[in-house]
Amino acid sequence: MKTKTPATRQGTRTRTAGPADPPTRARRDAAATRAALLAAAVAEFARHGYAGARVDEIAKLAGINKQLVYHYYGSKEDLYQAALESVYTELREKERSLSLGELQPAEAMVKLIGFSFDYLSTHPEFISMLTDENRNQGQHITGAKPLRAMHRPFVEMLEATLERGVAAGTFRADYDAINLYISIAGISYFFFSNNHTLSAIFGKRLHTKAALAQRRRHVIEFTMNSLLVDPARKT
């Protein structure tokens, strides 16, 4: 006697998982939307400043509905602060990736100075946003705890590099990390933020590759000559 196999219900099929379940896909879409919004916000705020930037233009650049801007970031001010944090975060992450602790102190410092110059050269939006924020007395960055927290690891890395250099007899002992970094950043920042006026005043095209290379060498040599115990010994 044959045993009958129970018939399967007509129309039922075994569910095959798709590339991503709806909740996962939604999370990915939300992350992509937020990233597009931040990129558009950085571009708009860098171009027009906080006061001149328009939320509807940011939405247009991001390719989304204007209401989604408020859904994800609440207000123009919140979006601006997020954009400001994002440009700082990118810089700090790239600085940490330099792995200065793996290099000899002088070599590490040369690498950091060169990186700082190159970063400003290729990120004019960073310069524009910082200039605008300082024009507004730093009102959006003051008290921003995430920004303070992200700076601490970099300062500690710079302090460790200085201490190693002092211990090796390479660096002067009267430099502190924060003042040194302000000098490194300030020398390059002034050059790029005032490049057009400096070019006009001195009658030189300071934005050419040759001019940038010459300035980069000068910034490194100028800083290292003040930091080294024996400037003749670069590494």
Can you annotate each of these PLM segments?
Residues R96-S128, R148-H151, V155, A177-Y181, ...:
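Hydrophobic alpha-helical connector segments
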